[in-house]
Amino acid sequence: MQDDILESEMSKAPQLQQESQEGQDKQTLSPPGHQEPPGIISELDNALPEENQLEKGTMENANGKETLRLESPVLSGFDYQETTGIGTLAQSSSSSSSSLTGFSSWSTAMPPNPSTLIEEVGFFNQAATTNNAPPPLLFQSFSHHTSTGFGGNFSHQIGPLSQHHPSPHPHFQHPHNQHRRSSASPHPPPFSHRSAAFNQLPHLGNNLSKPPSPWGSYQSPSSTPSSTSWSPGGGYGGWGSSQGREYRRGGVNPLNSISPLKKSFPNNQTQTQKYPRNNSGFNTKPWVEDTINRNESIFPFQERSRSFDGFSMHSLENSLIDIMRAEQDSLKGHSSLFPMEDERSYGEDERSDQSLSGLGSPHSFPHQNGERIERYSRKVFVGGLPPDIDEDEITASFRRFGHLFVDWPHKAESKSYFPPKGYAFLLFQDESSVQALIDACMEEDGKLYLCVSSPTIKDKPVQIRPWNLNDSDFVMDGSQPLDPRKTIFVGGVPRPLRAVELAMIMDRLYGGVCYAGIDTDPELKYPKGAGRVAFSNQQSYIAAISARFVQLQHGEIDKRVEVKPYVLDDQLCDECQGTRCGGKFAPFFCANVTCLQYYCEYCWAAIHSRAGREFHKPLVKEGGDRPRHISFRWN
């Protein structure tokens, strides 16, 4: 009996294969570029006889035995619901053909060519494949809604797929196949043993399980205070931490050395001033052109990894500006993605005749912990005044910006009522008055001007030169700790010179500069005419102090200044460590290259009585930066 059944099945096998081949030929008559309209697969399934339906559900090998059919890739959002119980082959094929109509949205990028759809996916049975298959296709643009079965309209583009991957027989299905998902699905699978495999995909497991972070993986370098660190204000403390002053971003101003907050853009306004604003843009230095847009990169250090070149201003400046930008953003609590108010264009609300405070100005100051962040010194230089203008007339010309006091060098001693050299200083009571003054100025060749009248001269343009607090400090190499034993004092620094420019000059001369700072008044935060430069190595430090004098050349600045070791007033004696002087701080420092140490009075006398050291001269700290009270009446 079994032999008869076997012979009948073998006789039917060629007929079934021939009918299946005819059905495939009908299905693939359309050219590869042709796309079938929806519903054509359902019509073909209904037109096929039951024997052909049987062929879709199973495949037979050469021995006539039933083998596992090729299952189609189970895609994201469609949980395959296996049929419970054992059904007939016809029932299995019927459920498979009807389930093919369950995909609601298929990627339109699928090639309609049937030859490209006969793919072997990683979870296919290798023994059931009949040809050499290329790498699997990934389909990622379908819906991610989970359903317990297949339903809806099936897209026309996977018609050829149904011819080669019919549904499996219930005998050979495993329980875990009920929830099989595509590896491209962003939803986690229902089982923990698949979650691990899903999370191993670097472009899926980590990114799709959570929203992308705009901050990336970058962490700004933290400044670690050490016993040898000191503050830019001249005190003793950590990196750039000083009393009454935040850490300065020593980045180069994107516009000019006078007004980094002003920006002019082309507009339709008619300029009636004597010195119109330069709408074509400011004449910036070549190595600061790409710092105008400070928020152009999310990751500050990833795109500028060039090596430092002490003589290449371009490569050095780009990297340094990024370092300072990131450190300043991390310390002030804001990100480069969200620029401060001074980054906005001046053309948004340009009013050259803005009066009084800067509340209505487009450059309104941001607030941090309820307090406004200061950007400028309250002391402003005014040059080119008319020779016959007196103090009252100067006050009247600038009183519209806020309460102020007019001062000039040796004013109290000279008893003069007129500025003797044609310049003066405006000391404003409120820092916002300085911003209002800047907004009212005209810009010409990178300088700010404001028209002032005297009894004999009408509307004479005078130069306005405010001091940006960010220009007080500049870190060239944040990876190096600040060592006061490798720091020099630079006296007679021109007041317009910024910290970044001082660092560039010293690094070009001696190399190894890691920090530069401009000494400022603790109350008004205006430059005092001195600076500090810290080196990262002893050789550069010794070379600088051995020179004694340095020629500072930058732009219009060309001045010879004195260089000395930077002396601290809180160091113990290097010889006795305070044992011979009762633990008092050492008052003397020997700047000779054979010593370079702090000494108490006893050790100085003992060491420098030796032959060859009797001519060494001690350096004494002239006094720290102590707040001073200015007694005058605001006008």
UniProtKB/Swiss-Prot annotation:
Residues 341-353 have a biased composition (Basic and acidic residues). Residues 166-182 have a biased composition (Basic residues). It holds the Pfam family CEBP_ZZ. Residues 1-70, 149-284, 337-369 are annotated as: Disordered. The keyword Phosphoprotein does not apply. Residues 216-231 have a biased composition (Low complexity). One of its GO terms (biological process) is cellular response to amino acid stimulus. The keyword Cytoplasm applies. SMART domains: RRM (SM00360). One of its GO terms (cellular component) is perinuclear region of cytoplasm. Sequence-specific RNA-binding protein that binds to the cytoplasmic polyadenylation element (CPE), an uridine-rich sequence element (consensus sequence 5'-UUUUUAU-3') within the mRNA 3'-UTR. RNA binding results in a clear conformational change analogous to the Venus fly trap mechanism. Belongs to the RRM CPEB family. This is Cytoplasmic polyadenylation element-binding protein 4.
